[in-house]
Amino acid sequence: RQVLALFGAGHVAQALVPILAQLPLSVRWIDNRESLTPTEPLPANVDYLCDDEPVGEIPLLPAGSWVVIMTHDHQLDFELAEKALKHPDLPYVGMIGSQTKAKRFVHRLQSKGISDGQLSRFVTPIGLSDIPGKLPVEVAVSVSAQIIRRLHGVNATEAPLTADTTKEALHDTQ
């Protein structure tokens, strides 16, 4: 199973985990707030870890793990992104946030010596841009849709299906 490390246990992560749990993933859900430790039993493919220093979990991830960052703390998000991008065996580092946050983080990461090659693994804001909405469940669906595309080997930046491309695809099969 593909390992996915999810950093953060806020509203969006809580909406995302039940979706991820139904996919062929091994989810490591990590947060530094004891108060957000789930009280209900988690699915067998989801492990929750409360860790005061979540950045220390990055080097412990198996090679090939995907990283999704959605903590409550912008500085922690930055430290997680920087550490994950410096780890060459992590092919996907996705982070929740606005376009403004994304641009600011990319600039800060570049100033810290993160190369364009390393930044090519950084997907922010995470999720499919054509799925609108700010509710936690809407963001979770958008993020999970992007993860499903990756699971199926579809480039996450590939243009989404439109009415025109769907008509063309249907025409090609007739």
Locations of the language-model features?
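Hydrophobic, well-ordered beta-alpha structural blocks that scaffold small-molecule cofactor pockets
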Residues: 1-63, 70, 76-80
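N-terminal hydrophobic or amphipathic segments with adjacent small-residue motifs
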Residues: 2-4, 88-91, 121, 134
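Alpha-helix boundary recognition
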Residues: 21, 59, 85-86, 110
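ADP-ribose/adenylate-binding Rossmann-like module
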Residues: 30, 66, 70-74, 83-109
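Glycine-rich loops and low-complexity Gly/Arg-rich segments
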Residues: 30-32, 53-56, 73-75, 92-95, ...
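Adenosine-phosphate binding glycine-rich loop
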Residues: 96-174
